[in-house]
Design a protein with these regions (language model features):
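Terminal accessory/targeting
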Residues: 1-51, 58, 66-76, 188, ...
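Active-site beta->alpha N-cap acidic-glycine motif
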Residues: 27-114, 118-132, 138, 234
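A cross-domain feature marking catalytic cores of carbohydrate-active enzymes
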Residues: 53, 79-81, 103-105, 143-145, ...
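CE4/NodB-like, metal-dependent polysaccharide N-deacetylase domain
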Residues: 66-76, 100, 116-149, 154-158, ...
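Short histidine/acidic/glycine/proline-rich micro-motifs that form metal-
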Residues: 81-84, 107-110, 147, 169-173, ...
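Short, solvent-exposed loop/turn segments at secondary-structure boundaries
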Residues: 113-117, 175-178, 206-209
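Charged helix-capping and loop-helix junction motifs
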Residues: 120-123, 178-183, 209-213
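His/Asp/Glu-enriched short active-site or ligand-binding loop at hydrolase and phosphoryl-transfer sites
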Residues: 147-189, 223-234
Length: 235
């Protein structure tokens, strides 16, 4: 009898494994979601690229803003509502410098297996903090870690908002990456319409910050123009 039960349970186990695997890949997919629209890059022949900077703002913001100003390059900052509330002066400085500000949720939690109410609070609370900075432009949205399943995409679709991911991430999960590594990977992967993700606000951010002027100089020499995410999506 046990043998019969074991044989009968195999198809069930296979289905469970397949569902689990499918859910895992769906959560981390950069180019697909179950509802609404997701953008990892814009398909264009024009040599345009968007530089995006995730998390914060933190006390590194003044240094990052100086690097961007010296390079005369626009960026899209995906900021957390909690950090904006804690460091309103940095949010105001980012807005005053003319950069685009995007929504990266309030608490930077993984937005999977969450309730509609949680999604609403995470998104709308951050929108409110962004507007307090004086920023009046479009607010695009990026999920923390790029993770989403059903509730988040459904909410964004209902509110006519796009999920913005990326196609170049040279410093993600690489605590030992040097500025040389980050520059080399970026230059090797950028294509017309690329969205580049860097982390410059927390942790091991020095190499990423140091890489920005070199990335900008090299890509401009190759004929690229830097634009904000909303500008890129309007192409």
């Amino acid at each position: 009898m046990f043998r019969r039960w074991l044989i009968g349970s195999v198809p069930v186990l296979v289905v469970v494994v397949l569902l689990g695997t499918g859910t895992f890949y769906l959560m981390k997919a950069r180019t697909f979601q179950l509802a609404g629209h997701v953008v990892s890059r814009v398909h264009t022949d024009a040599r345009v690229v968007a530089l995006t900077l995730d998390d914060g703002p933190s006390d590194r913001a003044p240094e990052v803003l100086k690097v961007l100003a010296d390079a005369q390059v626009p960026a899209t900052f995906y900021l957390n509502g909690r950090d904006l509330a804690a460091h309103p002066e940095h949010g105001r400085a980012i807005a005053a410098a003319g950069h685009e500000i995007g929504n990266h949720t309030y608490t930077h939690r993984r937005m999977v297996f969450v309730t509609p109410g949680t999604v609403r609070d995470e998104v709308e609370g951050t929108d409110a903090e962004i507007r307090k900075t004086g920023y009046a432009g479009p607010i695009t949205f990026r999920p923390p870690y790029g993770k989403k399943l059903w509730t988040l995409p459904h909410y964004l679709a209902e509110h006519d908002r796009v999920t913005v991911t990326w196609d170049v991430e040279p410093d993600s999960g690489r605590a030992d990456a040097t500025a040389d590594d980050i520059v080399a990977e970026t230059l090797g992967k950028v294509r017309p319409g690329s969205i580049v993700l860097l982390h410059v606000m927390h942790g091991h951010a020095d190499p990423s910050i140091a890489a920005i002027p070199r990335i900008v100089a090299e890509l401009r020499a190759a004929g690229y123009e830097f634009v904000t995410v909303s500008d890129l999506m309007s192409r």
